[in-house]
Amino acid sequence: MKTKTLRRLFSMLAALVMGLSLLTGCNEKNAERTQEQEDAQTIQVYLWSTSLYENYAPYVQSQLPDVNIEFIVGNNDLDFYKFLQQNGGLPDIITCCRFSLHDAAPLKDSLMNLAMTNEAGAVYNTYLNSFKNEDGSVNWLPVCADAHGFVVNRSLFEQYDIPLPTDYASFVAACQAFEKVGIRGFTSDYTYDYTCMETLQGLSAAELTTTAGRKWRTTYSDPASTARVGLDDTVWPGAFERMEQFIQDTHLTADDLALNYDDVTGMFRNGEVAMYFGSSAGVKMFQDEGIDTIFLPFFSQNGEPWIMTTPYFQVALNRDLEQDTARREKAMKVLNVMLSEQAQNRIVSEGQDILSYSQNVPLRLTEYLKDVRSVVEENHMYIRIASNDFFAVSKDVVSKMIAGELTAEQAYQAFNAQLLADEEPADNETVLTSGKAYSNVFHANGGSAAFSVMANTLRGVYGTDVLLATANSFTGSVLQADYNQKMAASMIMPNGLMSRQRTMTGAELKETVHAFVEGCEGGFVPFNRGSLPVVSGIAVEVKENNGSYTLTGITRNGQPLGDNDTVTVTCLATEKQMEALLASDSGTSVGEDTWVKNTWRDYISGGATLAEPENYMTLR
């Protein structure tokens, strides 16, 4: 009798175990299906700067409430996207500011051809030509321009009765007149590669946009060619002659090579220099300080005025979108909004003008650019050649010209030789290996696995009980790959992410998590599920209601967080966000604030391992 009873019990137990196993398996399959559905419904947009995350991204999402857009702050570096491409992590939509077709060539076959889209058709041909591949395809489109030219202290001109420049000859005459009264007519921050590069090109914008100039640029940028391309002998020799003449006319010397932005703007503010090369944003800055400031273009020696422009960013779409009609349609909707006038208004700094390359965006100039209206209306907005080679070689060669070490002919030869030289092999020593790729799509049941890997790893690095991070802290690039130093460093958001450590009570931690999840006055407010924070050492429950979020629960080690618990907490955010999120009286300070990028770089240099992800958030 006892034996029969035991057998029945064993049978019932076995059936129960089997039932639980089947139920668990079903739940796991259901969870996988849900995550796959979330993946398919999500359009990922990588932003080149966190500044776009705060104003631009929320607007784009607000215009497309039926599209789940996940914005991630990536890197302003095409090498970063090449790495993602090589390891299966290229996002749906890419933005990059430091850009050239030359450097983007390896990505061409992975990007959609936008040539026949309405978005490409709206770009003025003058500018679209700079983005055409030799086969006529177009993978990248520019948004609005950042205008660079001469920031001019008009009050100094009036004080010394010196006429404002209207052409190159009068520009030189003004420089000479100021020198007679002990004031520099012109200088700029030639310690930077971009100032060297843009001066060289800006002085010859008229020539570089001729038929011969465009032909050379197309050849230089051709993604189908693997051969290195040097300078031509038609347009470029004259460019170095004009640079040499400019150096002589403005009396630039080796001393100017040490000047940075703060040095130059300080000289301008103090009336020590009348003109410098810079962005139109400088006009508003100095006008707000009470200095009568205007913006003037480059005066070409052939008489044409030109503005040097760089798109705030270029945008491209992943070709894989063409395999799914529904996802492609969603991505095109996102692109359309990203390029709209209203969205572009949220890219520029306060008071700056929108100089759009698109015919769909009307020209509305403020007082800060009214002096160059005719230049803009004539489409004399030159888009710089901005390959990595051009940045580096311009810095080297133009600096030597300013120092008096190279003549125009020598500079041309040196520049050409460096462009043609074989690339030095990159430092590909592996500092970090990830044996598994983790999804960086936010899932309602768990959060983002890739972000969780980063948060859990950094919690161990900082030796803290809890880590809280704004969603823009990580680039989401936890791939199954070997990482060199540069790519490992790029796993952290590049724009000034800092850490602050506190010892807190449970009540103080609840208040802090509340600010991260729901937003706070003067700080960042999450605008979609992908912008919710990342946490480690705790798990949170959040309620979603038409784009707003409410914290409903916090657990630690599986138990509700107690108000009297004591925990060490590390918070990650930009400096501006940190001040709003974590007031000085929130807990007790533990050490000084540090830059996360530096901490991460030190960690990976010492032989890093990545932590496993955890389900850190449940969104209901």
Give the ranges of each region predicted by the language model:
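Long, aromatic- and glycine/proline-rich binding clefts that accommodate carbohydrate-like moieties
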Residues: 296, 346-400
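Conserved N-terminal structural module of periplasmic/extracytoplasmic solute-binding proteins
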Residues: 20, 26-101, 164, 410, ...
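Extracytoplasmic/periplasmic solute-binding protein
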Residues: 139, 172-228
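Extracytoplasmic/periplasmic substrate-recognition and gating elements
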Residues: 287-350
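Hinge/lid segment of periplasmic solute-binding proteins
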Residues: 97-148, 163, 172, 198-199, ...
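Catalytic centers of hydrolytic enzymes
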Residues: 427-620
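Extracytoplasmic "Venus flytrap"/periplasmic binding protein-like
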Residues: 62-126, 155-166, 266-267, 274-275, ...
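Glycine-centered hinge/linker elements that transmit conformational signals in sensory
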Residues: 218-257
